[in-house]
Amino acid sequence: MTTDTIVAQATAPGRGGVGIIRVSGDKASDVAMAVLGHLPKVRYADYCDFKAADGAVIDQGIALYFKGPNSFTGEDVLELQGHGGQVVLDMLIKRVMDVDGVRIAKPGEFSEQAFMNDKLDLTQAEAIADLIDATSEQAAKSALNSLQGEFSTQVHELVDQVTNLRLYVEAAIDFPDEEVDFLSDGKIAASLGKIITKLDSVQSSAKQGAIIREGMKVVIAGRPNAGKSSLLNALAGKESAIVTEIAGTTRDVLREHIHLDGMPLHIIDTAGLRDTTDTVEQIGIERAWAEIETADQVLFMVDGTTTDAVDPHDIWPDFIDRLPKNLGVTVVRNKADLTGESLDATDEQGHKVFRLSAKTGSGVDELKAHLKSLMGYQSNLEGGFLARRRHLEALELASSHLALGQEQLEVYQAGELLAEELRMCQLALSEITGKFTSDDLLGKIFSSFCIGK
Protein backbone atom coordinates (compact mmCIF):
# COMPACT_ATOMS: atom_id res chain seq x y z
CA MET A 1 0.00 0.00 0.00
CA THR A 2 1.27 3.45 -0.93
CA THR A 3 2.79 5.73 1.73
CA ASP A 4 2.52 8.78 -0.49
CA THR A 5 0.38 11.73 0.41
CA ILE A 6 -2.11 12.38 -2.38
CA VAL A 7 -3.99 15.47 -3.50
CA ALA A 8 -6.81 16.07 -5.98
CA GLN A 9 -9.74 18.32 -6.70
CA ALA A 10 -12.80 16.75 -5.11
CA THR A 11 -15.35 18.91 -6.92
CA ALA A 12 -16.15 18.76 -10.62
CA PRO A 13 -13.79 20.63 -12.99
CA GLY A 14 -14.88 24.04 -14.22
CA ARG A 15 -16.53 27.03 -12.64
CA GLY A 16 -18.60 26.72 -9.49
CA GLY A 17 -19.55 28.45 -6.28
CA VAL A 18 -17.27 26.23 -4.19
CA GLY A 19 -14.17 24.23 -5.08
CA ILE A 20 -12.66 21.60 -2.79
CA ILE A 21 -9.11 20.29 -2.68
CA ARG A 22 -8.59 17.04 -0.77
CA VAL A 23 -5.29 15.87 0.72
CA SER A 24 -4.76 12.47 2.35
CA GLY A 25 -1.66 10.96 3.93
CA ASP A 26 1.07 11.50 6.49
CA LYS A 27 2.03 14.85 4.96
CA ALA A 28 -1.44 16.38 5.36
CA SER A 29 -0.34 18.24 8.50
CA ASP A 30 2.77 19.52 6.69
CA VAL A 31 0.54 20.79 3.88
CA ALA A 32 -1.63 22.60 6.43
CA MET A 33 1.39 24.29 7.98
CA ALA A 34 2.72 25.30 4.54
CA VAL A 35 -0.54 26.59 3.06
CA LEU A 36 -2.35 27.84 6.18
CA GLY A 37 0.50 28.63 8.52
CA HIS A 38 -1.09 26.55 11.28
CA LEU A 39 -2.74 23.17 11.88
CA PRO A 40 -6.53 23.53 12.20
CA LYS A 41 -8.29 22.06 15.20
CA VAL A 42 -9.37 18.51 14.39
CA ARG A 43 -12.90 18.29 12.93
CA TYR A 44 -13.51 22.05 13.22
CA ALA A 45 -14.21 24.41 10.31
CA ASP A 46 -11.43 27.01 10.20
CA TYR A 47 -11.91 30.10 8.00
CA CYS A 48 -8.48 31.28 6.90
CA ASP A 49 -6.19 32.38 4.07
CA PHE A 50 -4.66 29.87 1.65
CA LYS A 51 -1.17 31.21 0.99
CA ALA A 52 1.50 30.82 -1.68
CA ALA A 53 5.12 30.10 -0.78
CA ASP A 54 5.91 33.85 -0.70
CA GLY A 55 3.02 34.54 1.66
CA ALA A 56 0.70 35.97 -0.99
CA VAL A 57 -2.94 34.96 -0.55
CA ILE A 58 -4.16 32.53 -3.22
CA ASP A 59 -7.70 32.29 -1.86
CA GLN A 60 -9.74 32.45 1.31
CA GLY A 61 -11.96 29.66 2.52
CA ILE A 62 -12.61 26.92 5.04
CA ALA A 63 -10.02 24.35 6.10
CA LEU A 64 -11.05 21.03 7.67
CA TYR A 65 -8.56 18.66 9.26
CA PHE A 66 -9.30 15.04 10.15
CA LYS A 67 -6.81 12.97 12.11
CA GLY A 68 -6.51 9.34 11.00
CA PRO A 69 -7.92 6.81 11.48
CA ASN A 70 -11.04 8.91 12.06
CA SER A 71 -11.39 10.08 8.47
CA PHE A 72 -12.85 8.86 5.19
CA THR A 73 -9.56 7.31 4.04
CA GLY A 74 -8.37 6.25 7.49
CA GLU A 75 -5.38 8.59 7.09
CA ASP A 76 -4.79 12.21 8.03
CA VAL A 77 -7.01 14.27 5.71
CA LEU A 78 -7.03 17.99 4.94
CA GLU A 79 -9.79 19.61 2.92
CA LEU A 80 -9.47 23.13 1.57
CA GLN A 81 -12.82 24.59 0.54
CA GLY A 82 -12.48 27.77 -1.47
CA HIS A 83 -13.98 29.50 -4.47
CA GLY A 84 -14.79 27.36 -7.49
CA GLY A 85 -12.71 29.03 -10.18
CA GLN A 86 -10.58 26.46 -11.97
CA VAL A 87 -7.50 28.71 -12.15
CA VAL A 88 -7.59 29.27 -8.38
CA LEU A 89 -7.98 25.55 -7.72
CA ASP A 90 -5.09 24.71 -10.05
CA MET A 91 -2.91 27.25 -8.24
CA LEU A 92 -3.86 25.72 -4.91
CA ILE A 93 -3.04 22.18 -6.04
CA LYS A 94 0.31 23.38 -7.35
CA ARG A 95 0.98 25.01 -3.96
CA VAL A 96 0.10 21.81 -2.09
CA MET A 97 2.51 19.85 -4.28
CA ASP A 98 5.36 22.15 -3.20
CA VAL A 99 5.44 20.00 -0.06
CA ASP A 100 7.80 17.04 -0.48
CA GLY A 101 6.12 13.64 -0.75
CA VAL A 102 2.82 14.91 -2.16
CA ARG A 103 1.58 13.80 -5.58
CA ILE A 104 -1.59 13.93 -7.65
CA ALA A 105 -4.04 11.16 -6.78
CA LYS A 106 -4.98 8.50 -9.30
CA PRO A 107 -8.66 7.99 -10.17
CA GLY A 108 -10.48 6.47 -7.20
CA GLU A 109 -7.38 6.47 -5.01
CA PHE A 110 -9.07 8.12 -2.01
CA SER A 111 -11.75 5.41 -2.05
CA GLU A 112 -9.08 2.76 -2.57
CA GLN A 113 -7.23 4.01 0.51
CA ALA A 114 -10.49 3.85 2.46
CA PHE A 115 -10.93 0.24 1.32
CA MET A 116 -7.34 -0.69 2.16
CA ASN A 117 -7.74 0.82 5.62
CA ASP A 118 -10.99 -1.08 6.28
CA LYS A 119 -13.13 2.06 6.26
CA LEU A 120 -15.21 0.61 3.42
CA ASP A 121 -15.63 -2.80 1.87
CA LEU A 122 -15.54 -3.17 -1.90
CA THR A 123 -19.30 -3.03 -2.45
CA GLN A 124 -19.49 0.20 -0.44
CA ALA A 125 -16.60 1.70 -2.40
CA GLU A 126 -18.32 0.80 -5.67
CA ALA A 127 -21.52 2.37 -4.35
CA ILE A 128 -19.79 5.76 -4.19
CA ALA A 129 -19.27 5.72 -7.95
CA ASP A 130 -22.78 4.37 -8.50
CA LEU A 131 -24.30 7.14 -6.37
CA ILE A 132 -22.47 9.76 -8.43
CA ASP A 133 -23.58 8.13 -11.70
CA ALA A 134 -27.20 7.52 -10.64
CA THR A 135 -29.72 8.50 -13.32
CA SER A 136 -32.89 8.10 -11.26
CA GLU A 137 -34.14 8.56 -7.72
CA GLN A 138 -34.47 4.78 -7.46
CA ALA A 139 -30.84 4.26 -8.50
CA ALA A 140 -29.62 6.97 -6.12
CA LYS A 141 -31.50 5.52 -3.16
CA SER A 142 -30.35 1.99 -3.93
CA ALA A 143 -26.74 3.17 -4.28
CA LEU A 144 -27.00 4.92 -0.92
CA ASN A 145 -28.34 1.72 0.63
CA SER A 146 -25.30 -0.12 -0.73
CA LEU A 147 -23.00 2.59 0.60
CA GLN A 148 -24.60 2.21 4.02
CA GLY A 149 -23.86 -1.52 3.92
CA GLU A 150 -27.18 -3.18 3.07
CA PHE A 151 -25.69 -5.44 0.38
CA SER A 152 -22.53 -6.06 2.41
CA THR A 153 -24.52 -7.06 5.48
CA GLN A 154 -26.43 -9.72 3.56
CA VAL A 155 -23.23 -11.09 2.04
CA HIS A 156 -21.49 -11.13 5.44
CA GLU A 157 -24.44 -13.03 6.93
CA LEU A 158 -24.17 -15.63 4.17
CA VAL A 159 -20.42 -15.97 4.66
CA ASP A 160 -20.92 -16.48 8.41
CA GLN A 161 -23.57 -19.15 7.82
CA VAL A 162 -21.41 -20.98 5.29
CA THR A 163 -18.37 -20.76 7.58
CA ASN A 164 -20.28 -22.13 10.57
CA LEU A 165 -21.66 -25.03 8.53
CA ARG A 166 -18.22 -25.77 7.15
CA LEU A 167 -16.78 -25.91 10.69
CA TYR A 168 -19.55 -28.28 11.71
CA VAL A 169 -18.86 -30.57 8.72
CA GLU A 170 -15.11 -30.51 9.32
CA ALA A 171 -15.71 -31.41 12.95
CA ALA A 172 -17.60 -34.46 11.72
CA ILE A 173 -14.69 -35.39 9.47
CA ASP A 174 -12.35 -35.26 12.47
CA PHE A 175 -14.37 -38.09 14.02
CA PRO A 176 -14.55 -40.61 11.14
CA ASP A 177 -16.46 -43.21 13.13
CA GLU A 178 -19.28 -40.74 13.61
CA GLU A 179 -19.07 -38.96 10.23
CA VAL A 180 -21.92 -40.91 8.64
CA ASP A 181 -24.18 -40.15 11.60
CA PHE A 182 -23.29 -36.45 11.38
CA LEU A 183 -24.04 -36.33 7.68
CA SER A 184 -27.32 -38.21 7.89
CA ASP A 185 -28.87 -36.72 11.04
CA GLY A 186 -30.62 -33.98 9.03
CA LYS A 187 -28.98 -31.02 10.74
CA ILE A 188 -26.46 -30.37 7.97
CA ALA A 189 -29.09 -30.79 5.25
CA ALA A 190 -31.42 -28.37 7.04
CA SER A 191 -28.68 -25.78 7.51
CA LEU A 192 -27.57 -26.12 3.90
CA GLY A 193 -31.16 -25.71 2.72
CA LYS A 194 -31.54 -22.48 4.70
CA ILE A 195 -28.32 -21.10 3.22
CA ILE A 196 -29.45 -21.95 -0.31
CA THR A 197 -32.79 -20.21 0.30
CA LYS A 198 -31.02 -17.15 1.67
CA LEU A 199 -28.62 -17.05 -1.28
CA ASP A 200 -31.52 -17.34 -3.74
CA SER A 201 -33.13 -14.32 -2.09
CA VAL A 202 -29.92 -12.27 -2.27
CA GLN A 203 -29.46 -13.29 -5.92
CA SER A 204 -32.96 -12.12 -6.76
CA SER A 205 -32.36 -8.75 -5.09
CA ALA A 206 -28.97 -8.42 -6.78
CA LYS A 207 -30.46 -9.10 -10.22
CA GLN A 208 -33.01 -6.35 -9.60
CA GLY A 209 -30.23 -4.06 -8.42
CA ALA A 210 -28.19 -4.79 -11.53
CA ILE A 211 -31.14 -3.87 -13.74
CA ILE A 212 -31.56 -0.56 -11.90
CA ARG A 213 -27.86 0.19 -12.35
CA GLU A 214 -27.09 -1.22 -15.79
CA GLY A 215 -30.49 -1.22 -17.45
CA MET A 216 -32.81 -3.92 -18.68
CA LYS A 217 -32.24 -5.51 -22.09
CA VAL A 218 -35.55 -5.82 -23.91
CA VAL A 219 -35.73 -7.61 -27.26
CA ILE A 220 -38.66 -7.01 -29.60
CA ALA A 221 -39.28 -10.27 -31.47
CA GLY A 222 -41.95 -11.78 -33.67
CA ARG A 223 -42.93 -12.58 -37.22
CA PRO A 224 -42.20 -10.20 -40.11
CA ASN A 225 -44.47 -7.16 -40.46
CA ALA A 226 -45.85 -7.44 -36.93
CA GLY A 227 -44.81 -3.85 -36.19
CA LYS A 228 -41.58 -4.44 -34.28
CA SER A 229 -39.73 -1.49 -35.82
CA SER A 230 -42.75 0.76 -35.30
CA LEU A 231 -42.73 -0.17 -31.62
CA LEU A 232 -39.00 0.57 -31.37
CA ASN A 233 -39.65 4.03 -32.83
CA ALA A 234 -42.58 4.60 -30.46
CA LEU A 235 -40.57 3.62 -27.39
CA ALA A 236 -37.51 5.62 -28.48
CA GLY A 237 -39.57 8.65 -29.43
CA LYS A 238 -37.82 8.98 -32.78
CA GLU A 239 -37.50 7.32 -36.17
CA SER A 240 -34.72 4.87 -35.36
CA ALA A 241 -35.86 2.11 -37.70
CA ILE A 242 -37.10 2.15 -41.29
CA VAL A 243 -40.75 1.14 -41.44
CA THR A 244 -42.41 -0.17 -44.62
CA GLU A 245 -45.20 -2.53 -45.57
CA ILE A 246 -42.60 -4.91 -47.02
CA ALA A 247 -42.04 -7.97 -44.84
CA GLY A 248 -38.40 -8.43 -43.86
CA THR A 249 -37.43 -4.74 -44.04
CA THR A 250 -35.39 -5.08 -40.84
CA ARG A 251 -32.56 -7.52 -41.51
CA ASP A 252 -30.09 -6.60 -38.80
CA VAL A 253 -30.21 -5.82 -35.11
CA LEU A 254 -31.13 -2.22 -34.21
CA ARG A 255 -30.34 -0.88 -30.74
CA GLU A 256 -31.67 2.09 -28.80
CA HIS A 257 -30.68 3.16 -25.29
CA ILE A 258 -33.41 5.19 -23.61
CA HIS A 259 -34.42 6.26 -20.11
CA LEU A 260 -37.92 5.85 -18.71
CA ASP A 261 -38.11 8.31 -15.82
CA GLY A 262 -34.38 7.85 -15.37
CA MET A 263 -34.47 4.05 -15.56
CA PRO A 264 -32.07 2.77 -18.26
CA LEU A 265 -33.55 0.56 -20.94
CA HIS A 266 -31.75 -1.16 -23.82
CA ILE A 267 -34.22 -1.87 -26.62
CA ILE A 268 -33.29 -4.30 -29.39
CA ASP A 269 -35.29 -4.51 -32.63
CA THR A 270 -34.72 -7.74 -34.53
CA ALA A 271 -35.39 -9.24 -37.92
CA GLY A 272 -38.73 -10.96 -38.39
CA LEU A 273 -38.52 -14.65 -37.51
CA ARG A 274 -39.50 -17.03 -40.31
CA ASP A 275 -38.14 -19.75 -42.57
CA THR A 276 -36.32 -18.16 -45.49
CA THR A 277 -33.83 -19.02 -48.22
CA ASP A 278 -32.46 -15.48 -48.33
CA THR A 279 -28.88 -15.70 -47.00
CA VAL A 280 -28.78 -12.14 -45.64
CA GLU A 281 -32.14 -12.53 -43.92
CA GLN A 282 -31.00 -15.84 -42.39
CA ILE A 283 -28.01 -14.08 -40.84
CA GLY A 284 -30.35 -11.45 -39.40
CA ILE A 285 -32.58 -14.13 -37.90
CA GLU A 286 -29.57 -15.88 -36.33
CA ARG A 287 -28.53 -12.58 -34.77
CA ALA A 288 -32.07 -12.08 -33.52
CA TRP A 289 -31.97 -15.38 -31.64
CA ALA A 290 -28.54 -14.52 -30.24
CA GLU A 291 -30.03 -11.33 -28.77
CA ILE A 292 -33.07 -13.16 -27.42
CA GLU A 293 -30.86 -15.64 -25.57
CA THR A 294 -29.19 -12.83 -23.57
CA ALA A 295 -32.32 -10.71 -23.01
CA ASP A 296 -33.91 -9.81 -19.68
CA GLN A 297 -37.35 -9.52 -21.28
CA VAL A 298 -38.88 -10.30 -24.67
CA LEU A 299 -41.69 -8.27 -26.19
CA PHE A 300 -43.47 -10.88 -28.32
CA MET A 301 -44.93 -8.72 -31.09
CA VAL A 302 -48.14 -10.06 -32.61
CA ASP A 303 -50.06 -8.69 -35.59
CA GLY A 304 -53.55 -8.46 -34.09
CA THR A 305 -55.16 -8.64 -37.54
CA THR A 306 -53.89 -12.19 -38.06
CA THR A 307 -55.08 -13.91 -34.86
CA ASP A 308 -57.40 -13.40 -31.90
CA ALA A 309 -55.24 -15.57 -29.63
CA VAL A 310 -53.66 -14.05 -26.52
CA ASP A 311 -51.86 -17.06 -25.03
CA PRO A 312 -48.34 -17.04 -26.54
CA HIS A 313 -48.36 -20.86 -26.70
CA ASP A 314 -51.46 -20.69 -28.89
CA ILE A 315 -50.05 -17.90 -31.06
CA TRP A 316 -46.70 -19.52 -31.86
CA PRO A 317 -45.79 -22.60 -29.78
CA ASP A 318 -42.48 -23.27 -31.55
CA PHE A 319 -41.25 -19.76 -30.74
CA ILE A 320 -42.19 -20.00 -27.06
CA ASP A 321 -40.67 -23.48 -26.69
CA ARG A 322 -37.34 -22.25 -28.05
CA LEU A 323 -37.04 -19.35 -25.60
CA PRO A 324 -34.52 -19.69 -22.74
CA LYS A 325 -35.94 -20.94 -19.47
CA ASN A 326 -37.05 -18.20 -17.04
CA LEU A 327 -36.95 -15.50 -19.73
CA GLY A 328 -39.78 -13.05 -19.17
CA VAL A 329 -42.24 -12.71 -22.06
CA THR A 330 -44.69 -9.85 -22.58
CA VAL A 331 -47.20 -10.30 -25.38
CA VAL A 332 -47.88 -7.16 -27.42
CA ARG A 333 -50.93 -7.36 -29.67
CA ASN A 334 -50.29 -4.62 -32.21
CA LYS A 335 -52.52 -2.80 -34.72
CA ALA A 336 -55.35 -2.10 -32.28
CA ASP A 337 -56.24 0.83 -34.53
CA LEU A 338 -57.28 -1.74 -37.14
CA THR A 339 -58.77 -4.48 -34.92
CA GLY A 340 -60.70 -2.12 -32.66
CA GLU A 341 -59.45 -3.92 -29.54
CA SER A 342 -59.69 -2.05 -26.26
CA LEU A 343 -56.33 -0.68 -25.12
CA ASP A 344 -56.05 -2.67 -21.93
CA ALA A 345 -53.60 -5.08 -20.31
CA THR A 346 -54.54 -8.54 -19.10
CA ASP A 347 -52.83 -11.56 -17.58
CA GLU A 348 -53.01 -14.68 -19.73
CA GLN A 349 -51.41 -17.96 -18.61
CA GLY A 350 -48.77 -16.15 -16.57
CA HIS A 351 -47.97 -13.62 -19.30
CA LYS A 352 -48.88 -9.95 -19.46
CA VAL A 353 -50.74 -9.06 -22.68
CA PHE A 354 -50.88 -5.49 -23.99
CA ARG A 355 -53.05 -4.20 -26.81
CA LEU A 356 -51.78 -1.12 -28.60
CA SER A 357 -51.09 0.62 -31.85
CA ALA A 358 -47.40 1.23 -32.44
CA LYS A 359 -48.33 3.34 -35.46
CA THR A 360 -50.51 5.84 -33.58
CA GLY A 361 -48.83 5.45 -30.19
CA SER A 362 -52.07 4.51 -28.44
CA GLY A 363 -51.38 2.16 -25.53
CA VAL A 364 -47.60 2.62 -25.65
CA ASP A 365 -47.53 4.57 -22.37
CA GLU A 366 -49.11 1.60 -20.59
CA LEU A 367 -46.38 -0.65 -21.99
CA LYS A 368 -43.71 1.81 -20.81
CA ALA A 369 -45.21 1.73 -17.31
CA HIS A 370 -45.04 -2.07 -17.40
CA LEU A 371 -41.36 -1.99 -18.40
CA LYS A 372 -40.61 0.45 -15.57
CA SER A 373 -42.31 -1.86 -13.09
CA LEU A 374 -40.18 -4.77 -14.34
CA MET A 375 -37.09 -2.67 -13.60
CA GLY A 376 -38.30 -1.99 -10.06
CA TYR A 377 -39.35 1.61 -10.59
CA GLN A 378 -40.77 3.00 -7.34
CA SER A 379 -40.96 -0.54 -6.02
CA ASN A 380 -40.03 -0.37 -2.34
CA LEU A 381 -38.16 2.91 -2.85
CA GLU A 382 -36.65 2.74 0.64
CA GLY A 383 -35.19 -0.72 0.11
CA GLY A 384 -33.01 -2.52 -2.37
CA PHE A 385 -29.40 -2.10 -3.33
CA LEU A 386 -27.39 -1.76 -6.52
CA ALA A 387 -25.36 -4.66 -7.89
CA ARG A 388 -22.81 -5.03 -10.64
CA ARG A 389 -22.16 -7.79 -13.14
CA ARG A 390 -19.24 -9.11 -11.08
CA HIS A 391 -21.53 -9.43 -8.06
CA LEU A 392 -24.01 -11.52 -10.04
CA GLU A 393 -21.21 -13.75 -11.33
CA ALA A 394 -19.85 -14.27 -7.81
CA LEU A 395 -23.32 -15.09 -6.45
CA GLU A 396 -23.91 -17.52 -9.32
CA LEU A 397 -20.57 -19.21 -8.61
CA ALA A 398 -21.40 -19.47 -4.91
CA SER A 399 -24.79 -20.94 -5.78
CA SER A 400 -23.21 -23.58 -8.02
CA HIS A 401 -20.84 -24.64 -5.22
CA LEU A 402 -23.76 -24.98 -2.80
CA ALA A 403 -25.63 -27.11 -5.34
CA LEU A 404 -22.59 -29.36 -5.76
CA GLY A 405 -22.20 -29.52 -2.00
CA GLN A 406 -25.82 -30.55 -1.62
CA GLU A 407 -25.22 -33.34 -4.13
CA GLN A 408 -22.14 -34.53 -2.22
CA LEU A 409 -24.24 -34.65 0.95
CA GLU A 410 -27.44 -36.22 -0.32
CA VAL A 411 -26.08 -38.60 -2.97
CA TYR A 412 -22.58 -39.55 -1.86
CA GLN A 413 -22.47 -38.74 1.89
CA ALA A 414 -19.02 -37.27 1.14
CA GLY A 415 -18.16 -34.97 4.02
CA GLU A 416 -14.75 -33.85 2.76
CA LEU A 417 -16.10 -32.92 -0.67
CA LEU A 418 -19.01 -31.06 0.93
CA ALA A 419 -16.55 -29.11 3.09
CA GLU A 420 -14.52 -28.20 -0.01
CA GLU A 421 -17.60 -26.93 -1.86
CA LEU A 422 -18.49 -24.83 1.19
CA ARG A 423 -14.97 -23.41 1.20
CA MET A 424 -15.23 -22.47 -2.48
CA CYS A 425 -18.63 -20.90 -1.85
CA GLN A 426 -17.10 -18.88 0.98
CA LEU A 427 -14.33 -17.60 -1.31
CA ALA A 428 -16.80 -16.60 -4.04
CA LEU A 429 -18.93 -14.63 -1.59
CA SER A 430 -15.91 -12.98 0.03
CA GLU A 431 -14.77 -11.68 -3.36
CA ILE A 432 -17.91 -9.52 -3.49
CA THR A 433 -16.89 -7.49 -0.44
CA GLY A 434 -13.20 -7.58 -1.32
CA LYS A 435 -11.94 -9.85 1.45
CA PHE A 436 -10.40 -12.10 -1.19
CA THR A 437 -9.91 -10.08 -4.38
CA SER A 438 -7.07 -9.90 -6.89
CA ASP A 439 -5.05 -6.71 -7.27
CA ASP A 440 -5.97 -6.64 -10.97
CA LEU A 441 -9.67 -6.51 -10.14
CA LEU A 442 -9.13 -3.79 -7.55
CA GLY A 443 -7.21 -1.73 -10.08
CA LYS A 444 -9.96 -2.13 -12.66
CA ILE A 445 -12.68 -1.11 -10.20
CA PHE A 446 -11.02 1.96 -8.72
CA SER A 447 -9.61 3.23 -12.02
CA SER A 448 -13.19 3.81 -13.20
CA PHE A 449 -13.79 6.31 -10.38
CA CYS A 450 -13.49 10.08 -10.63
CA ILE A 451 -10.21 11.68 -9.60
CA GLY A 452 -10.73 13.06 -6.11
CA LYS A 453 -13.06 10.23 -5.04
Swiss-Prot record:
Residues involved in GTP binding: 225-230, 244-250, 269-272, 334-337
One Gene Ontology molecular-function label: metal ion binding
The protein's Enzyme Commission number: 3.6.-.-
Signal peptide (from-to): none
Binding-site list for Mg(2+): S229, T250
Binding site for (6S)-5-formyl-5,6,7,8-tetrahydrofolate: R22, E79, K119, K453
Domain TrmE-type G residue range list: 215-376
Domain of life: Bacteria
Localization terms from the record: Cytoplasm
InterPro entries named in the record: G_TrmE, GTP-bd, GTP-bd_TrmE_N, GTPase_MnmE, MnmE_dom2, MnmE_helical, P-loop_NTPase, Small_GTP-bd
PROSITE patterns listed in its UniProt record: G_TRME
Co-factor binding comment: Binds 1 potassium ion per subunit.
GTP-binding among keywords: yes
Keywords: Cytoplasm, GTP-binding, Hydrolase, Magnesium, Metal-binding, Nucleotide-binding, Potassium, tRNA processing
UniProt-annotated binding residues for K(+): N225, T244, I246, T249
Cofactor(s) listed: K(+)
A GO BP annotation: tRNA methylation
GO CC, one annotated term: cytosol
Keyword S-adenosyl-L-methionine included in the entry's annotation: no
Subunit structure: Homodimer. Heterotetramer of two MnmE and two MnmG subunits.
Recorded family membership: Belongs to the TRAFAC class TrmE-Era-EngA-EngB-Septin-like GTPase superfamily. TrmE GTPase family.
PANTHER family registered for this protein in UniProt: TRNA MODIFICATION GTPASE GTPBP3, TRNA MODIFICATION GTPASE GTPBP3, MITOCHONDRIAL
Function, in words: Exhibits a very high intrinsic GTPase hydrolysis rate. Involved in the addition of a carboxymethylaminomethyl (cmnm) group at the wobble position (U34) of certain tRNAs, forming tRNA-cmnm(5)s(2)U34.
Name of this chain's protein: tRNA modification GTPase MnmE
Taxonomic classification: Bacteria, Pseudomonadati, Pseudomonadota, Gammaproteobacteria, Alteromonadales
Gene this chain is encoded by: mnmE
